[in-house]
A protein has these predicted regions:
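Thiamine diphosphate
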Residues: 55-133
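Short, charged low-complexity linear segments at domain edges
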Residues: 1-10
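Active-site diphosphate/adenylate-binding microenvironment
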Residues: 12-75
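Conserved small/polar residues in nucleotide/adenosyl-binding loops
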Residues: 137-139
Length: 139
């Protein structure tokens, strides 16, 4: 059996990460699967990506894709500021930010707005599961 390779001659398995521990059916795993597929199809080198995340269920997802890339899990709502700094000193990396509904639109709304205002060079994915799932008291 011949394995399918992308333009970089990498197997799709080179783009995966660890096994998910998220609740079945929330949708975050499907987002991770689509990130894997897009990065593989577009021939993006995993080592040239920096995954940034905040706090919450969504912040766990970077562990499930692009396992050979760089990553940083930041303080709740503050991921855009950390990404700004990392972006300024690491021009050779592409930044992929993953944040949840609470992390982005609640405590992090100010950070999010300023990242937009600064026109920060990153892909920012908001994963909305509709709850503050990891803090449990909000469910």
């Amino acid at each position: 059996m011949m394995l399918k390779l992308n333009v970089l001659e990498l197997e799709k398995s080179e783009y995966t990460g660890g096994k998910s521990s998220l609740c079945p059916g929330c949708g975050h795993d499907q987002i991770s699967n689509n990130i894997i597929q897009a990065a593989w199809e577009n021939g993006i080198q995993p080592e040239k990506i920096a995954k940034m995340s905040g706090i919450g269920c969504s912040s766990k997802t970077p562990a499930y894709f692009l396992g050979k890339s760089h990553g940083f899990n930041t303080v709740h709502g503050r991921m855009p500021s950390v990404t700004t700094g990392a972006n300024l000193v690491n021009k050779g990396l592409s930044f992929l930010a993953v944040s949840g509904d609470g992390d982005t639109a609640s405590i992090g709304i100010g950070q999010f707005v300023h990242a937009i205002r600064r026109n920060l060079d990153m892909v920012y994915i908001v994963e909305n599961n509709g709850v503050y799932g990891l803090s449990l008291i909000h469910i």
